[in-house]
């Protein structure tokens, strides 16, 4: 089995690296490397989310929950909480993340709060995602060590080297292409494993009769029952906080996944389908496999046994599963590890690159410099992730430690979306206090062993409530942003608007709103700027009364229309431009790109290249044409633009304005 496994792993890694090399041709600039040009469709994103959910760490984490606390804790406390979290996240943030123009969680929080908040959140997100990366690699390292007899240090190191090489090659394009292969392999492997043990030993009645505890559903092998509302970890309350809220709402790579979608609807629907259907189908077999291992080998995995949940799957594979199936499952385990770890690796790379390197260290860097820096950053992040593999407590506590840092970030996300009165100072001090308490808790508890707060309250609860209480109290005693002030109205009111001089950049932003409703993402992507620049301009235009937000809450807060006074300060359009605006709500350039697409998708790309449009410049116009109902975006991964009947009518009506 050893020889067959090594050969299969080498072949698999060679195929994945080859796929990454193939996808490299799609990377045109730094935005392509990190966002894949915002081109992914529904099926592609569902498969991506499944690949992220089907993490290699689950092969040790889920069986550990089963053996320590029973099936209910693993299935309800983790799997169902995670699935529900996907659904809620998709509903609340699917359109918001895609429409606000930011690329990272930290960047989004700057456009709502301040640059200081962005820096704090960038640090917290980086720590979290490095911990999650390490957790996934450590899990697969444990399984390979147990099954093949290799030292854990060697297996963990080999996995990290492979992931770093693979991820550095082609960014999100390569990760996505290979993820679609890997989720199929991993899904078949783990569903097949659960089905195999049930077919061989019997159904759930056999499991209940042989599991080394009186109640396989409620009680672990040592007789431990998971509390419901305890503030310690794990309880159903802390499990829910970590895996339904924090890991999603505060994590950058879930935010990135929404930003790679063609539109917010694709993001929302893909999260909902994954959470409702795919996560239970993919993850419950892993929980059952862990439970069956303890039932088959009660002496080894029972209360007096020497083995635990982290070794359960590897032990089951070695003792009960035929060699060909073992090799396939090993490849599946490696596949999902590479998938999730590479996604979290690029998530933290994007945070450090965009929120620290481009903003603080090298704000004037060009595309080539940013792309080069991203690869160096990814390598450094990989090294730190490798070191975190040796965090005390194993996969369960490493996962809990990593996700607990997301508590303050999740609070800021919630308040940013639904409470305009939450102030910049409240966000900063809430996040800072939460992170300081988390740091002290980790230092004095896990590192120095002086005082372990986890004996009383888990770090996730500590971070959540400290950030919430401090943030709310400070907000009540500090001045909010203008739109949170009493008396501010969404619709322009002369008593609350103040005219200010406009820069050339402000006029460019305002001009983009004159052709009908437009999103912050379309403005930011088209102008090729950081969203803090577009945010500053939009806020100035709003305070002048030149634009109108569609709503004061959620994603429509980042949808804008021009007002009559805004139209008045712009230079008048030509007769042809005015006709095009009245008939189609398009600028001349937008119409010409539509006309180019009417010939063929390839012709549209030539049109964009001739005007030196980057990946996101193109996406901004295509997104707007999609919103207007003039095009459809098809294709599994790479986008293909096809005109609708309405789009063809517009082109035919104004064909004299087309240049191609």
Regions found by a protein language model. Name each.
Residues 502-505, 584-590:
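Short helix-coil-helix linker/hinge
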Residues 506-511, 590-597, 622, 651:
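Hydrophobic residues on short alpha-helical segments
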Residues 516-527, 600-612:
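Short acidic, hydrophobic short linear motifs in intrinsically disordered regions
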Residues 551-560, 635-641:
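Short, Lys/Arg-rich nucleic-acid/phosphate-binding segment
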Residues 562-587, 645-660:
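Short, amphipathic alpha-helical interaction segments positioned at domain boundaries
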């Amino acid at each position: 089995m050893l020889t067959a496994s090594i050969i299969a792993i080498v072949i698999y890694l060679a195929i994945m690296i080859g796929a990454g090399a193939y996808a490299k041709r799609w990377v045109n600039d730094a935005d392509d490397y990190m966002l894949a040009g915002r081109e992914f469709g529904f099926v592609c994103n569902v498969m991506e989310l499944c690949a992220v959910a089907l993490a290699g760490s689950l092969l040790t984490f889920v069986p550990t929950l089963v053996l320590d606390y029973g099936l209910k804790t693993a299935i309800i406390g983790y799997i169902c909480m995670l699935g529900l979290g996907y659904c809620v996240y998709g509903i609340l943030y699917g359109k918001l993340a895609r429409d606000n123009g930011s690329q990272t969680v930290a960047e989004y929080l700057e456009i709502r709060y301040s640059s200081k908040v962005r820096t704090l959140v960038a640090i917290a997100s980086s720590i979290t995602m490095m911990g999650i990366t390490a957790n996934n690699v450590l899990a697969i390292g444990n399984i390979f060590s147990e099954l093949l007899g290799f030292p854990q240090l060697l297996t963990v190191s080999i996995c990290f080297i492979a992931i770093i090489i693979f991820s550095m090659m082609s960014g999100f394009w390569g990760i996505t292409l290979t993820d679609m292969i890997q989720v199929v392999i991993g899904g078949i492997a783990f569903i097949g494993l659960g089905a195999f043990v049930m077919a061989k030993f019997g159904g759930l009645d056999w499991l209940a009769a042989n599991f080394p505890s009186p109640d396989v559903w409620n009680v672990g092998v040592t007789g431990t029952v998971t509390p419901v509302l305890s503030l310690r970890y794990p309880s159903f309350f802390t499990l829910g906080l970590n895996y339904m809220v924090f890991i999603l709402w505060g994590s950058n790579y879930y935010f990135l996944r929404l930003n790679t979608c063609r539109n917010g609807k694709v993001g929302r629907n893909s999260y909902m389908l994954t959470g409702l259907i795919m996560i239970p189908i993919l993850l419950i077999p892993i929980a059952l496999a862990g439970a069956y291992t303890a039932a088959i080998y009660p002496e080894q995995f029972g209360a007096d046994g020497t083995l635990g949940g982290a070794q359960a799957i590897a032990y089951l594979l070695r003792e009960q599963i035929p060699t060909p199936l073992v090799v396939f499952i090993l490849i599946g385990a490696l596949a999902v590890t590479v998938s999730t770890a590479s996604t979290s690796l690029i998530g933290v790379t994007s945070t450090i690159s965009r929120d620290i390197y481009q903003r603080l260290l090298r704000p004037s860097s060009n595309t080539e410099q940013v792309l080069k820096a991203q690869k160096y950053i990814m390598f450094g992040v990989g090294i730190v992730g490798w070191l975190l593999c040796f965090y005390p407590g194993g996969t369960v506590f490493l996962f809990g430690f990593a996700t607990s840092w997301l508590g303050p970030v999740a609070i800021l996300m919630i308040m940013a979306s639904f409470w305009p009165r939450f102030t910049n100072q409240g966000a900063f001090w809430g996040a800072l206090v939460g992170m300081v308490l988390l740091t002290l808790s980790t230092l004095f508890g896990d590192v120095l062993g002086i005082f372990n707060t986890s004996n009383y309250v888990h770090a996730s609860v500590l971070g959540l409530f400290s950030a919430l209480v401090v943030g709310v109290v400070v907000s009540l005693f500090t001045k909010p942003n203008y739109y949170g002030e009493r008396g501010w109205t969404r619709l322009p009111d002369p008593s609350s608007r103040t005219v200010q001089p406009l820069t050339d950049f402000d006029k460019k932003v305002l001009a983009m709103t004159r052709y009908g409703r437009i999103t912050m993402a379309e403005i930011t992507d088209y102008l090729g700027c950081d969203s803090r620049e577009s945010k500053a301009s939009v806020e100035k235009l709003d305070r002048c009364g030149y634009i109108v937000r569609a709503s004061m809450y959620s994603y429509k807060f980042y949808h804008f229309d021009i007002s009559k006074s805004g139209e008045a300060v712009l230079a008048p359009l030509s007769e042809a431009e005015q006709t095009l605006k009245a008939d189609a709500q398009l600028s001349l350039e937008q119409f010409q790109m539509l006309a180019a697409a009417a010939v063929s998708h390839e012709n549209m790309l030539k049109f964009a290249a001739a005007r030196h449009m980057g990946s996101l410049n193109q996406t901004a116009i295509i997104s707007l044409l999609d919103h207007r109902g003039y095009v459809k975006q098809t294709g599994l991964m790479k986008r293909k633009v096809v005109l609708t009947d309405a789009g063809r009518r517009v082109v035919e009506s104004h064909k004299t304005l087309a240049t191609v």
